[in-house]
Amino acid sequence: IIIIDKVLEECTYNSKGLVLEKLSYLKEKDFLKAAKVPYKTDSLIAPSPAKLLRQLENQFVNNIVRRQKELTDTEFENQKNSFLNDADMKQIILCLNLIKNGEQVVLVTEETESSNDNKLFKKIPAICKELEIETMTLPELIAKYDGIDVDFQ
């Protein structure tokens, strides 16, 4: 299980930091150092950057939303760059790199492929489907692997 820096960062402000409150070890410096968490993504590059950019502009964009928002080319480029640097795309880029290196990868997400909430870019499962990256929800992952046990208090 890999936790990237962008996801850990989002955990601090999503749901008032509930994840970090319940999983307090994710704030403990000794644990973070020993577990090599979080995975740093600041210099993470896609295996084929030009191809990914083309896919982002052509396949992963919600063109209906793009037209509705009447974005200029500059505005679109700014939003595309923001999306490339957010947690969703960093997870996807990491998965692409791991797959390239022969790793078996599953991206765990609670997002669904369909609901897009009027966002400019598609959700993780839709992008992963195009890129042939397997996705699962946390309950699906727990059901698949017998050794995983979760205790809710």
Q: Where does each model-flagged region fall?
A:
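Acidic, metal-binding active-site segment of PIN/NYN-like and related structure-specific nucleases
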Residues: D86-V150
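Active-site-proximal, substrate-binding regions of enzyme catalytic domains
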Residues: I1-V105, E113-S114
